[in-house]
Amino acid sequence: MTDQARTAAEPAAAPRVDPQQRRTVLVLVLAQVLSGAGLAAGITVGALLAADMLATTAYAGLPAALFTAGSAAAALVVGRLSQRWGRRAGLTSGYLTGAVGAAGVVVAAVLDDVVLLFVAFAVYGAGTATNLQARYAGADLASPRHRGRAVSTVLVATTVGAVAGPNLVGVMGDLAAGWGIPPLAGPFLLGGAAYAAAGVVLWVLLRPDPLLLARERAEQAALAPTAPASAAQTTATATLAPPPPVVEPTDRQVRRTVLLAGTIMVLTQGVMVAIMTMTPIHMEHHGHAVATAGFVIAVHVGMMYLPSPLSGWLTDRFGPVRVAVAAAATLLAAGLVSALVPPSSVVGLAVGLGLLGLGWSLGLVSGTALLTTSVPLEVRARTQGSVDLAVALAGAAGGLGSGFVVASSSYAALALGGGVLALLVLPVIAFAGRAPRRTSPAGTV
């Protein structure tokens, strides 16, 4: 099927202002606001809780690695569930699993059980995977020319909860202490409640299911009869020159495009998780309070999501490949700033982490739009889940490796290395653009 035919068969043929797309985005926005708090709560104190229970910082990156390892497995499962049963079933299952993981972290902290803690961290990662998978649901019914903005609208909704979460660390810690729970486990109480609420919202309100509706529309468009041309139209057409051939991507080009989209998101996630994970530890070692680290992480998470509308507009306006290059440059700048500012400078670290969040936003939105456009509906959710599996594994590697890099070298080395690593997307862009396209007569499918 050509890109033109696929576009015609997809929701682009629907009315310009699609009420079902508008409803879908509104429901997703509500769920993302809730789940954002769960997403950010564990990020801020996960490493600190593990360091406190293990009495060493050498494994401080392990919680992020376990979050993302669990996220990797959940991404695949949520993608498969969505492919078969729709987004509603897949996303709801993922959020409820994340809520169970949050409860497990709290129990492990109370019992001082490190093994249970690590298992719970992995289960908690399902919420992270689901939060990211929701962006695909926002694009299911969107027209191809507005997919970047649809993705970014869902992502930006996460900001409210994601920024509030880290800043509630102190409040939730005091609340937990009053209940006899270790203060560092307090944010996971918030995370569990937030994930559970998001799951309930999606199960109750995400009707009709956007992916199932998109498939139904595509099938109806494919079966719709073509109106016969009149005799006058036939005669007029016969006197015209044949239409120009349509240049469509070969299977190789489609595979390379999927590879490029995946690489953009893999590098973006790996670099972001590595630097973000060790920043609270770096700040604590230089005398900053936990609340101060929470502020820096709040800036970072805010910049991950608040610029999403800009990232979406840039992607729709200039194309995902150019925005991916901008993402790599921004991540490099983030690494340089984070490495070179004095450890005592809260403002400097906030700027570095803010740039890190912006680079992540540019990379994720551009990669998502590129992937969604290149994959047909019949295998879209499964392919998206597989790509998100690779993205989560990259985050796991970044989180796990970050602790060892800082322990054996320095935070500055980690930040610089991450910034340089982001530039690896450039040769992949060159490689993806080399595959030939096949030419077919206009109007063929």
Residue ranges and their predicted role:
Residues 18-48, 122, 254-271, 354:
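Pair of pore-lining "gating" transmembrane helices in MFS-fold secondary transporters
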Residues 33, 114-129, 348-362:
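Hydrophobic core of transmembrane alpha-helices in multi-pass small-molecule transporters
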Residues 46, 129-143, 362-375:
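Intracellular juxtamembrane helix-capping segments at the cytosolic ends
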Residues 74-86, 173, 307-320, 406:
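Helix-to-loop junctions at the C-terminal end of transmembrane segments
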Residues 96-111, 330-343:
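C-terminal ends and interior cores of transmembrane alpha-helices
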Residues 144, 153-204:
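Helix-loop-helix hairpin linking two adjacent transmembrane segments in secondary transporters
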Residues 169-170, 192-219, 428-432:
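C-terminal membrane-cytosol helix-exit motif in multi-pass small-molecule transporters
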Residues 321-367:
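C-terminal transmembrane helical hairpin of 12-TM major facilitator-type secondary transporters
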